[in-house]
Every structure is written in structure tokens, then in C-alpha cells.
Amino acid sequence: DVISKSIKKEGEVIGIGSFLYQQGRLTWALKVYKKGRQITRNPYAFANEVANIHLQLGEFAQATEEYLKLYYANPQNYSAANLSILNMVGPPSQNEIEQALLRAVDKRPSDRGLRNMVFEFYVLAENFMEAFVQVKSIDRLFKQEGERVYNFAETMRNNKEYALSNKAYDYIINRHKNSPFFFQAHFQKAINNELKAFDQVPVDKASVEAAVDAYKELLNTFGRKPEYYDPVYRMSRLMVFYLFDLDNALEELENLTASRQGLPQDRWAEARLLIGDIQLMQQDFNKSKLTYTEVSDIYRDRQLGALAKYKLSELAYYKGEFNLAQALLGAIKDNTSNDISNDAIKLNLTIMDNTGLDSTTTALEMFANAQLLTYQRDYEASLSLLDSLAYKFPSHPLADEILWEKATIYLNQNEIERALSFI
């Protein structure tokens, strides 16, 4: 009654309500603003002030409803209302906010802003399955051709939720065959499996196989064309270095590089270097050397040329041609990438440290040969040679490198405990 008699104008509401709020008289302040709504005949008036009072009282559902009134009053207030709601999200408030939002959507099922708020709430609350349900509804209701679902899939990848990310990509693949996101959904699904494989130590072979299968499905669907270089190359790398499926990878890459038409030069050279790696694994040293040299000559002063030179130096090192290896390493320019430069320095130091002590290079030749066998995935032969090396040269400076090479081999074979015993 006191409030009803004392407040007659809209202008008085803010002044009195604000004063009571600052004095901590929250219940009285709430009554003032409700009286103000009666005076203005506007159910959305003073929504921000009322929401803040409910928030202070721990009444999160009512606070959510009031912030929503900001949006109802003017859709341009969407961002402010949504941010205010999301800022409340936490263990004490989560359930109340969720229920308030769902009640709002139930009353206004076609309101895109509300749908987005619910979706963003679930993402922030890390209730990703419910977020997926909401984003699919948004896609269907507002005919978004999979765009929002695609963005959700990327968010799930960033959260390392690879299985749910793939579900989102599958949704696009199954429902949006004419969407601009159709090809990318196939491609990114394969990349997800690849990322999942490398999230584990050692690399998860089943995930690698799943990635290769996904790349094959993509290429069988869209064709093996120059514009689909990325999936062919990524698939081939997995086949070479993790599945050791050399023949099929070589066939894919040779078909890809048979004609340079439509394929950027850098991509062609990158694929040729991988072909050289396969030839080295197949012990076809002459072909490997020719392939690396081809790229080195064409890209003499560029990063790919430096990488080709480094691979040529590695090949010489594996064959025990240490002087040639050092000459090739010396030809690598200082402006190459850090990775190539660091690898070149490391290899050069290995040669220098193990050829300058005496006239014999037998130990280094054996070690280089063992590393080649490891590269070729002939682990048993490599371990046998490393054991012989350690026996013949028990106090050699290569002792630590021998242990590290053994650890690498056992790690590649998923024998983690055994690998750790050599570190």
C-alpha cells in the first residue's frame, strides 16, 4: 500500500527501485518494479533490473525469464539477454536455467533466437548430446542446409569429442547431399578419425584404419580428381607410415601425379616426395634418389627443395655415404623451416660425432643401417643389428642413441613398458 501510494509516475520507479536495491532491500525493490509495470502497462518494463534482483536472491529460473523479456521486448537485445543468461550458468543454477529456457521454447517453438539460446546453453554446460539435438532442430526448422550442424561438429572436434563430431558430419552426409558442406563433412569426418588416432600413445591403429576407410569412402563418392588432392595425400601418408600398405599408397600417389594438369606445383612435389619415401621403404634406392633429386632440382631455393635435399642426405646416410650426406646437408640454406634445419643439424652432428674419433666408421654404418631397417618397418632385423652393435662397441658414443632407437621400435609395436625400460 505504501508503494502504491508513493509511486505515481514511471520516472519515480527507477529512482526508488535503485535506492532500495543499493540498500539491500531486494524484496521491496522488486515490488517497486512490479508497480512500475502496472503504471506503464508494459509486462516487459524494467526486465533487466528485475532479473538482477532475482539473480541476487538466487532465483535463477525467474532471472532467466526476466532476461528473456529483454529479448521479447526487442529482438535486438538478443545478444545482451543471451550473454546475461549464459553468465549465470553453473552447478547451482544450471537446472533452473534449463527448465526456464525449455518452457520458453515450448511456448514459442518457432522462435529462432530462443532455439539458439537453448543450444548455446547446452554447449556451455557441456551437455553436448542435448546440444546436438537442438542444433539438428534448428537446422530442420530454419532450413540451414547443415551450416550450423557443421559448425557444431567443429566445436566438438575442438573439445576432442570425435564420436559426436562424426555424428554431426553423418547428419549432413545423410540429409544434405546438395549442401555446400556435403564434401567437407566427408573430409572432416576422415580427419576426425586421424586426429583421434594421434591423440593416443602409441598411435591407435584401429582409428588409423577408420580414417583410411573414411578417405576411401570420400574418394569413391567424389572421384580421385586433382581438386581432391588433400584426402588422397592424407590417406596415402597413413597407409605408408602407419599401415605399411606401400603398394596401394604408391598406386594412389602415382595416379595423382601422373598429370600435373589441375594440380598445384607444390602439391605435386609434396606427393612426389612421399613416393620417394615409399621407394626407400621398398629398398629401391635408385628410384628413391631419382625422385628426391627431381624435386630438389625443380625447387632448388624453396622449402620443398630443402626438404628434398634433406631426404637425399638421409638416403646417403643410410647407405653409409657419410661425406656425401654432409655435403648435401651443407647445401641446405639457412632460411629453411625450423623443422628441416633442426633435423639437418642433428643428422650432421651425428655424423661428425661418430666419424671424427678414429678412422673407422663401422659402428655408425651399423647404426645407420639399423635406422633404415626401422624406417622400413623391419623391426626384428633392426633390433638384432642394434644388439650386435652394442655388443661389439660397448662403450661407443652411440650407446644412448642405440637405446633410444630400441625404445622407438617397441613403442611402434605398442610395447610401452618395454619401450620405457630403454629410456
Walk through the language-model features, giving the residues of each.
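Acidic, polar-rich low-complexity tracts and alpha-helical solenoid repeat scaffolds
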Residues: D1-I423
